[in-house]
Amino acid sequence: MSRSVEHLVLMGVSGCGKTTAALNLHNALGWPVAEADDFHPGANIDKMSRGVALTDEDRWPWLKSMRDWMSERATEDVKTIATCSALKRSYRDLLSGAQGRVFFIHLLAQPDELQERMAHREGHFMPSSLLPSQFATLEPLSDDEDGVTVVSRATPEETFEAILAALEQASSDAG
């Protein structure tokens, strides 16, 4: 029997709607939100701002910080929402090591739509020029991973409804 979801990780490439979906879920569920971007050290942000893709060595400390944040909340019996690209299986495996059940929602959108979204996004350090490297790195969820893929819809509300349906299904599967 599966356990109920303690941590919901919204994953995917930049511009797929992770932040908007997380805010909508926070408003509906009241769970605290962690933006992975807030866990990056300054050196990582500087690299990405200059259009330089991060290496695994850049990512491991950042991902461990996210995992530790989720585990700390779990010790307080607090369910969480996290936004994190989590592009590779190995990154998701590390995040899955958090205390409590970690459930991934892979938000999927078309590259041209992502370019459009990123062109209109203000105040974000991630340039759209890094999208191709993110797609090259992306390893979609495998059947044996705890999560589902949700198409990032035309409106944030439609995406939110699709995520809620997936979360309800995951929770009912927990029995």
Per-range role (PLM):
Residues L10:
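Hydrophobic anchor at the beta1->P-loop junction of P-loop NTPases
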Residues A98-R117:
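Conserved phosphate-donor/acceptor-positioning beta-strand/loop module used by diverse small-molecule
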Residues H120-I163:
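Small-molecule kinase domains that catalyze NTP-dependent phosphoryl transfer to phosphate-bearing small molecules
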